[in-house]
C-alpha cells in the first residue's frame, strides 16, 4: 500500500498547528488591548500607508520589517483592528510551524515536536 503524502502524520500536525495557532491568536487578540504595547505597529503601519518612511519621517521602535508587513495587511484588509490581529495571527502561524519543522529537523519525536510547537503557539 502506498504511503499517501497528503495524509501523513507530519502534514496533519502542520495543518492542525496552522488552524490552532491562527484561531487561538484571533480569539485572544480580540479579548482586549494593552495600550502601551498594542498600538506600536498599528500606528507605524498606518503611517507607511500614508506615504511616510521609517527613520526619515518618524522613529521606529523595532525595525521596519514588521511595520511594512503591517502596512501590507492594512492595504489588503483595511485599517482596522481585525487586520491588525490577523497580522499577529499570521506571524504566530509562521513561527509555530517553523518551530515544528526545526524540531523535526533535530530528529525530535514527532509528538514532542507537535506538543512543543502547540505550546509555543499559545505563548507567541
Where are these regions (language model features)?
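Start-transfer (signal-anchor) and selected internal transmembrane alpha helices
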Residues: 1-24
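Membrane-interface starts of transmembrane alpha-helices
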Residues: 9, 79-87, 109-113
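Extracytoplasmic catalytic/substrate-binding loops of multi-pass membrane glycan-assembly enzymes
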Residues: 29-44, 57-69, 79-82
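Luminal/periplasmic active-site loops of membrane-embedded glycosylation enzymes
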Residues: 44-54
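Transmembrane-helix motifs of polytopic, lipid-linked glycan transferases
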Residues: 86-108, 115
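Aromatic- and kink-enriched transmembrane "portal" helix at the membrane-lumen/periplasm boundary
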Residues: 81, 95, 117-124
Amino acid at each position: 500500500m502506498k504511503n499517501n503524502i497528503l495524509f501523513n502524520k507530519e502534514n496533519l500536525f502542520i495543518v492542525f498547528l496552522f488552524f490552532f495557532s491562527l484561531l487561538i491568536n484571533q480569539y485572544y487578540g480580540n479579548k482586549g488591548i494593552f495600550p502601551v504595547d498594542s498600538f506600536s505597529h498599528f500606528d507605524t503601519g498606518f503611517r507607511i500607508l500614508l506615504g511616510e518612511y521609517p527613520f526619515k519621517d518618524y522613529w521606529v521602535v523595532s525595525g521596519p520589517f514588521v511595520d511594512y508587513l503591517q502596512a501590507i495587511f492594512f492595504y489588503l484588509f483595511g485599517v482596522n483592528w481585525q487586520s491588525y490581529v490577523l497580522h499577529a495571527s499570521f506571524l504566530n502561524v509562521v513561527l509555530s510551524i517553523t518551530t515544528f519543522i526545526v524540531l523535526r529537523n533535530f530528529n525530535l519525536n514527532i509528538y514532542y515536536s507537535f506538543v512543543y510547537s502547540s505550546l509555543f503557539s499559545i505563548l507567541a
